[in-house]
């Protein structure tokens, strides 16, 4: 019981956007690893569930998400990756989600995004933030080790496939995803990379991605994949959509974006998708948390790069 009360105290601290001690991060990551190592590359999730897209260290907007969507454990959540980078509070955001995962493992599912990577976080903010807030890279090391244990995808009620980016020309079936050795840094190419980097595009077949990783995939590819796996749709994140969510290919692919006013300047709204026990869909649209609730960030954001 002492462990749970410790964890509850840490969750309360993190909810207030207060850091926990480095030794507590180490212990939290060790517990998280024990839970995550048991999860499948295609983690099974039961409805009802609320599906969320990118957060990118926008901690106060994550709090707003919980305000409109309900708290853990009352609401069952699936987050589709990109917890860190670009926002001011990647450390607090990731540690809060991880602490909730350890405390309520059956009520929150975290899958990996392309930013859950050592290489990417060294460029886009998380590494520098860990260094600034903890005075060393140790916390970054603990967290990036956990990234390697995150599931690559999820399947809700056997019918809705959830993944950060999209499909891969190397993957026709969910069973092929299940055979990937995920406990590694995100590779530069290949199926694991594609799942985290690809985007839908109004085309047929496969196209070269302007991102330099993953592929563009067309409606025919999705139709084949959905039929082969007897699923209704693919749900993904990875791309900013100004309206918070966007349907593609006759409602067979859905993009969900959950970081409002992305990078504190894009002016977009955010969305989360509520699925009931019959997989009926309800979108909740929300805006950035009001300025007065935010506190003052400790540093200007990282330099601009393409969004």
Swiss-Prot record:
SUPFAM superfamilies listed in its UniProt record: Metallo-dependent phosphatases (SSF56300)
Annotated protein name in UniProt: Serine/threonine-protein phosphatase 4 catalytic subunit
Catalytic machinery residues: 115 (proton donor)
Needed cofactors: Mn(2+)
A molecular-function term among this protein's GO annotations: phosphatase activity
Modified residues (Leucine methyl ester): 307
Keywords from the named record: Acetylation, Cytoplasm, Cytoskeleton, Hydrolase, Manganese, Metal-binding, Methylation, Nucleus, Protein phosphatase
Subcellular location field: Cytoplasm; Nucleus; Cytoplasm, Cytoskeleton, Microtubule organizing center, Centrosome
Positions with a binding annotation for Mn(2+) 1: 54, 56, 82
Main location: cytoplasm
Cofactor binding: number and manner: Binds 2 manganese ions per subunit.
Classification via Pfam families: Metallophos (PF00149)
Cellular component aspect of the GO annotation: centrosome; chromatin; cytoplasm; nucleus; protein phosphatase 4 complex
The keyword Cytoplasm is annotated on this UniProt entry: yes
Cross-referenced PROSITE patterns: SER_THR_PHOSPHATASE
Assembly information from the UniProt record: Serine/threonine-protein phosphatase 4 (PP4) occurs in different assemblies of the catalytic and one or more regulatory subunits. Component of the PP4 complexes PPP4C-PPP4R1, PPP4C-PPP4R2, PPP4C-PPP4R2-PPP4R3A, PPP4C-PPP4R2-PPP4R3B and PPP4C-PPP4R4. The PPP4C-PPP4R2 complex appears to be a tetramer composed of 2 molecules of PPP4C and 2 molecules of PPP4R2. Interacts with REL, NFKB1/p50 and RELA. Interacts with SMN1 and GEMIN4. Interacts with IRS4 (phosphorylated). Interacts with SMEK1/PPP4R3A; the interaction requires PP4R2. Interacts with HDAC3.
Post-translational modification: Methylation at the C-terminal Leu-307 is critical for interactions with regulatory subunits and functions in DNA repair.
Similarity comment text for this entry: Belongs to the PPP phosphatase family. PP-4 (PP-X) subfamily.
SMART domains with a match to the protein in the record: PP2Ac (SM00156)
N-acetylalanine sites (modified residues): 2
Enzyme Commission code: 3.1.3.16
Role according to the record: Protein phosphatase that is involved in many processes such as microtubule organization at centrosomes, maturation of spliceosomal snRNPs, apoptosis, DNA repair, tumor necrosis factor (TNF)-alpha signaling, activation of c-Jun N-terminal kinase MAPK8, regulation of histone acetylation, DNA damage checkpoint signaling, NF-kappa-B activation and cell migration. The PPP4C-PPP4R1 PP4 complex may play a role in dephosphorylation and regulation of HDAC3.
Binding-site list for Mn(2+) 2: 82, 114, 164, 238
PANTHER family xref list: SERINE/THREONINE-PROTEIN PHOSPHATASE PP2A-RELATED
């Amino acid at each position: 019981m002492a462990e749970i009360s410790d964890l509850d105290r840490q969750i309360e601290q993190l909810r207030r956007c207060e850091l926990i001690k480095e030794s507590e991060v180490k212990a939290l990551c060790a517990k998280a690893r024990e839970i995550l190592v048991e999860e499948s590359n295609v983690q099974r999730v039961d409805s009802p569930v609320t599906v969320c897209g990118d957060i990118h260290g926008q901690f106060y907007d994550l709090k707003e998400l919980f305000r409109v969507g309900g708290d853990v454990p009352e609401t069952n959540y699936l987050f589709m990756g990109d917890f860190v980078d670009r926002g001011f509070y990647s450390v607090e955001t990731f540690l809060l989600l991880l602490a909730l995962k350890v405390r309520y493992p059956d009520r929150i599912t975290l899958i990996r995004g392309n930013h859950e990577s050592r290489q990417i976080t060294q460029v886009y903010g998380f590494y520098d933030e860990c260094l600034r807030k903890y005075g060393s890279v140790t916390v970054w090391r603990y967290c990036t080790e956990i990234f390697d244990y995150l599931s690559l995808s999820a399947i809700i009620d056997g019918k809705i496939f959830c993944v950060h980016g999209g499909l891969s020309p190397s993957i026709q079936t969910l069973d092929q995803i299940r055979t990937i050795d995920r406990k590694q840094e995100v590779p530069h190419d290949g199926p694991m990379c594609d799942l985290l980097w690809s985007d839908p595009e109004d085309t047929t077949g496969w196209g070269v991605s302007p991102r330099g990783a993953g592929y563009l995939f067309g409606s025919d590819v999705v139709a084949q994949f959905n039929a082969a796996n007897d699923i209704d749709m693919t749900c993904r994140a990875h791309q900013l959509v100004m309206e918070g969510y966007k349907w593609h290919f006759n409602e067979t692919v859905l993009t969900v974006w959950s970081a409002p006013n992305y990078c504190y300047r894009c002016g977009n709204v955010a969305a989360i998708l509520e699925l009931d026990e019959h997989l009926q869909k309800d979108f909740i649209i929300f805006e950035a948390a009001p300025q007065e609730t935010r506190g003052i960030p400790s540093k200007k954001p990282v330099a601009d790069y393409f969004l």
